[in-house]
UniProtKB/Swiss-Prot annotation:
Its EC number is 2.7.1.138. Optimum temperature is 40 degrees Celsius. One of its GO terms (biological process) is negative regulation of programmed cell death. The lineage of its organism: Eukaryota, Viridiplantae, Streptophyta, Embryophyta, Tracheophyta. Substrate binds at residues 204-207. A motif (CXXXCXXC) lies at residues 454-461. Highly expressed in leaves and at lower levels in stems. This is Ceramide kinase. Residues 276-286 have a biased composition (Polar residues). It comes from Oryza sativa subsp. japonica. It is an enzyme of class 2 (transferase).
Amino acid sequence: MEGGGEALFLDGVGEVTVAVGDDGLSFQPLHQEVSSSCWSSIIMQPKLESKLKFSDVYAVELLEVGPVCEPWNARATVQGKINTEMNRFVIHTVTRPRKRPSPWVPCEYIFGHKDQQTCKTWVEHIKTCINKEQDRPKSLMVFVHPLCGKGRGCKNWETVAPLFERAKVKTKVIVTQRAGHAYDTLASLSDKDLKKFDGVIAVGGDGLFNEILNGLLSTRHTNSYPPTPEGFGYFRNNMKCQEHRNNDLSNSELTGDDANAISGSSNTPDDHEPLLSTTRSTGLDISSSDSSDEPCNGDQVPLVSFPNNWFRLGIIPSGSTDAIVLSTTGERDPVTSALLIILGRRISLDIAQVVRWKSSPSAEVSPTVRYAASFAGYGFYGEVIRESEKYRWMGPARYDFSGTMVFLKHRSYEAKVAFLENGNTHSLTASAENNANGVQTLQYHQNRHRKTICRTNCLICKGTSTSEQNSEDENPDSSRTACETPKWVWSKGRFLSVGAAVISCRNERAPDGLVADAHLSDGFLHLLLIRDCPLPFYLWHLTQFTKKGSDPLSFKFVEHHKTQAFTFISSHDESVWNLDGELLQACEVSVQAFRGLVNLFASGPEV
């Protein structure tokens, strides 16, 4: 089997010599006189390749005795030698069209041999090789949203479920019955039970993924609240805040307001290094722990915490926008996402921690923690989601309708924003005094930075996933300096919207996303402050998002700050935030980015 290879018949090609290497197997025509017809057959079947990598093979199985077709040509048709009955086995792999980006396509290679034992030997050997791919999941918890998008959740799962079954991946499927179902399940799940799974999959949109994310992190992410500027006042008694938060966790009952907004709280002990790289935090590596039902050290089971080197999240897109999937895979395709999960692809993903201090100006200080994977937005972004709740019967079209209604109101909001400035960060670093008179006083940088787009095997994301110091040397574009005391910069006035993009947020309406050069795992937020401006100017700004290659952030009323943390204060009574499409009522929040806090079943976008 090794070395020179063995003669087999390949369906649609003919007799070939198959050789096994360290990373895959390859085949060549056995007879030179028929090589041209073999390869012309492969050319006519673009899904076939002459080499199969084990990293792309997700299953192999024996078939019943049946026909193995020779390559099609006129002579074979005349002679009637198209099909030959023999023992067979099939290799299930993936292929990609040569034009990129493009979806992944399942592909079958059917091999035949006269001897049944030879086929069995090949099957067992290939199984042994693909089982060495250690990153592949064995057991997954799957949440299916039956009503997301246009009701595609259940249908999409029915489409991809056979792929998981064929790959021998066990799945525990839960069809959600109500809002907060996934959150409640994961927040209440014991670590002992969670350790039975290699990951959690959302068959739905960004909202379901956000619910799963918050359910997992609410009691399993240990870190402090975001840093706040001097004068914000809520960290004067930090231990009291943390104690209040821990008490909330021990009760773990949802208030009515919290249930409406993806319920949850987070257990985070005091830590004086809130911007510490998450890769240096102490999290449990599930792959190195005992996954049996037997408890360790008496009755205690090792805690599951995040960041976590093994546990991963995944999305099979079925929502209205699917911005997270498009930003992390480049394809809004359920089959592609399913194959990425089955093959165990992995990337790290930044997560924004959002702490609501007050729900309204008259409310008492009561810190509540939420997490967002793609975007946190106020003003226009929040009002669109709130307005759309009235028109759920319209389906995905409600977002266009609500967006138009909110846009025509052209409402602005008085607010103050403070963000951490880093020395090399490209931003409009105007002071609060300079901004007091409005747009005209902003100092706009005409020479905008060179965009470095995040993609598969992104060097910036790979570099920042190791250590902060190394990332600085390896990635000059990561906009990080070794400043020990980052400076807080205030910006205040009337804003149409305030948004923080964790990732690019690509979607079908915005092909480049909100921030084209946002990275998946560089530890930064992209703070977007849209100041009050005439309605036609705002329309011009919004339409730029729909054009690939445009620069919607180049307007003078737009501030773009790349930062690790920011604080927001508003005096508006009904202030609402949009967190990955979910509502959170809050007039005072602080937000920070956690680098690579979770791992995703994805490989990055091909752009």
